[in-house]
């Protein structure tokens, strides 16, 4: 699963997920899956969506993952009293903002790509839309 190789600090504050995304265009492939709402997407969810797409296109074409889980989420163990510091890192998330491009694909028929994106979107906790590349 995706996670940073090394970070400056082990734990991070919760923070807020506000604003709009900057990576909102289809940059690498022909068609992209774009987030419509905001969420915290875990590394497991990203991997699950990637596997669903890869299996549907039968390992043809090329898939780009445009999000990376770089924020650690901590959790204290069960039945532990409050206090005594912050819990250990449980999993990693990517903070998704509206308009962010999640996945891109090319090299396969458009109908198959749309079906693959539909399978991937079912595994994600965010509403999505499919965007085609516009050539200027």
Curated annotation (Swiss-Prot):
Is tRNA-binding among the key words of this record?
Answer: yes
Pfam families, per this entry? Ribosomal_L16
What is a biological process (GO) this protein takes part in? translation
Q: Which molecular function terms from Gene Ontology are attached?
A: rRNA binding; structural constituent of ribosome; tRNA binding
Q: Which Gene3D superfamilies match?
A: Ribosomal protein L10e/L16 (3.90.1170.10)
- Summarize subunit and interaction data from the UniProt record for this chain: Part of the 50S ribosomal subunit.
Family, similarity comment: Belongs to the universal ribosomal protein uL16 family.
Protein name stated in the entry? Large ribosomal subunit protein uL16
Q: Could you tell me which species this protein originates from?
A: Ruthia magnifica subsp. Calyptogena magnifica
What is this protein's gene name? Answer: rplP
